[in-house]
A protein has these predicted regions:
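Intrinsically disordered, low-complexity segments enriched in small/flexible residues
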Residues: 1, 105, 192-196
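Glycine-rich ThDP/TPP pyrophosphate-binding loop and its adjacent helix/strand module
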Residues: 2-142, 327-339
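Thiamine diphosphate
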Residues: 137-144, 148-339
Length: 339
């Protein structure tokens, strides 16, 4: 429940619905509790209506402890390739304990009495926790066999695809899925015709487009600011529901989701960039921190970095943003000038 209260969740949901990302399935653990209270005090909107209006398929699981129900919902979600799906799984926090349904169990601990009460409810009172070797091996073997079967199936399909691909396409695809892309910027021709007077945004745009022509997995987008930041890959098309071959992502005014999605792209083998005005980097700060934590190769491009180059007033004029970015561990911050 708490996750869906966050602004980033709505940004991402709106973005996914707009692109009709039919392979996206979200399982929502709806126990109607957060750390401080039950959601009847803080979160009374209709989540199903919100997601439906954003273009999502909404499915329900009445009993969250039913693996069968959950499995049926996932199977149904997979069949819909034209809409992302959210599965609302109704659960009871602290089920079986004395604090069942009480938000205090959210971050609290079970007492010994609670523990014993739950065991009585499950019919295992008096039995110590144990995991016998034989059933443990059976579970392990099932997982291994399932994975082996799926891998063999994938290899078979991929071998058929490879027959239709040239050697460069195979190399690019395999370097992407195995996250082993290598490139040498020293071999890139940066013979750029700089104007005598041009903004760094214009210079950066020229560099980005040269890199894009040399590094095929360099993709990214703006939070509705590309016409100003100029962080756009010319001639590379925009990604849309009808065309996922583009290299430009139109995030709309969704800075938080822009940063988070860029992290996901980096984890999937791409070299993404994310851009907006410097003052709005604050909206991306949680995602930037995660990039730094995980050593992800995300390039954040922030323009309009001075109070002197924005005609929109104080809301668009950065003051403390540069210092806060420089204070972040494992984040390289460059501010070129007078080149």
């Amino acid at each position: 429940d708490g996750d869906l209260m966050e602004g980033i969740s709505y940004e991402a949901a709106s973005f996914a619905g707009n692109l009709k990302l039919g392979k996206l399935i979200v399982l929502y653990d709806s126990n109607k509790s957060t750390r401080d209270s039950n959601t009847n005090k803080t979160f009374t909107e209709s989540v199903s209506s919100r997601f439906a209006s954003a273009g999502w398929q909404v499915l329900y699981v009445k009993k969250g402890t039913s693996i069968t129900e959950i499995n049926k919902a996932i199977i149904k979600a997979k069949k819909n390739q034209n809409m992302p799906s959210i599965i609302i799984v109704n659960t009871v926090i602290g089920e079986g304990s004395k604090l069942e349904g009480n938000s205090s169990i959210y971050s609290g601990e079970l007492t010994k009495d609670d523990y014993e009460q739950i065991k009585r409810g499950l019919g295992v009172e008096g039995l110590p926790f144990t995991l016998l070797k034989e059933p443990a091996e059976n579970i392990r073997n099932q997982v291994v066999n399932r994975g082996t079967s799926l891998n063999d199936e994938w290899d078979k399909i991929y071998s058929e695809y490879k027959k239709e691909m040239n050697s460069n396409e195979v190399l690019e695809f395999e370097s992407l899925i195995y996250n082993s892309i290598n490139f040498d910027l020293t071999k890139v021709d940066f013979d750029i015709n700089y104007e005598q007077k041009e903004t760094l945004r214009e210079s950066n745009s020229k560099v980005m487009n040269i890199i894009s022509n040399s590094i095929w997995n360099f993709v990214g987008g703006n939070a509705d600011t590309s016409s100003s930041t100029l962080a756009y890959l010319n001639g590379k098309e925009d990604i849309s529901y009808s065309n996922f071959k583009g290299k430009n992502i139109l995030y709309g005014v969704r800075e938080n989701a822009c940063g988070a999605i860029s992290n996901g792209l980096a984890l999937s083998g791409f070299l993404p960039f994310a851009s907006t005005f410097m003052a709005f980097s604050d909206y991306m700060k949680p995602s930037i921190r995660m990039s730094a934590f995980m050593n992800l190769p995300v390039t954040y491009i922030f323009t309009h970095d001075s109070i002197t180059n924005s005609f929109d007033g104080p809301t668009h004029q950065p003051v403390e943003q540069l210092a806060s970015l420089r204070a972040m561990p494992n984040l390289y911050v460059y501010r070129p000038a007078d080149i």
